[in-house]
Amino acid sequence: EPGEKVTVYDIFYANSQGKFYVLFLVIFAVMFSTADIGSGYIKNIGGQVQKRGTLIFSKSIALAVFTVLTMAGAFLLQGAANYIVFKELTWGSSKAILSYFLTELALHYALVLICMAIAIILKNNVISMVIAICLTMNIMSIVYGLINSAVRKMGIQNFQIYKYTITGKISLLPMNPSGNECLEAFGVAIVFAVIMIAASSAVFQKRDI
């Protein structure tokens, strides 16, 4: 509202909704997921590990740490920027910040795992990077629109696919989310995370490295 102080949470929310943070995360995820394959490191240790698929879990843990540090660092950095620009520091509602931050953290991590799976399955950094970046852009709304149209032609009305996708949840999560909205977002994030880790592990286990 006019006359109100701009809080750190206001700017963080705007950047998060615009997928500013997730863009950096997915680029790193693609590069990190295939770095050890390209360097030959996996070939050296692959024979020593009975279940190579378990190496995906170590990647996912590393990406989880990176995601947490990136999101937390971005929030604190925004606080410093607000203080420099506005000569004062107002964080915003602690309850809203906590619920929104944790929910977005889960959603961002799920999208990072999706990009990890894409990179591992395709084994092509260029194509994987293009797909990852497209996931963070409005181009996905075109895909969602086509899916919605196809579903409506099947007789199912009022169906919106973006309500069940990670990118959709990232964009739709309100500034002061309710408990149900957070639970729904966490549910979508968990489902995608489990599927992506399982798919990546299965492919990595069977692939000739």
Functional labels for PLM-detected ranges:
Residues 1-32, 56-123, 132, 137-141, ...:
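Secretory targeting signals
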Residues 39, 82, 86-90, 148-152, ...:
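Perimembrane helix-loop junctions in membrane proteins
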Residues 50-51, 123-125:
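Short loop-to-helix capping motifs
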Residues 125-162:
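Transmembrane helix segments
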Residues 162-167, 186-195:
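Small-residue-rich transmembrane alpha-helices that serve as helix-helix interface/gating elements
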Residues 191-209:
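Junction motif at the cytosolic side of a transmembrane helix
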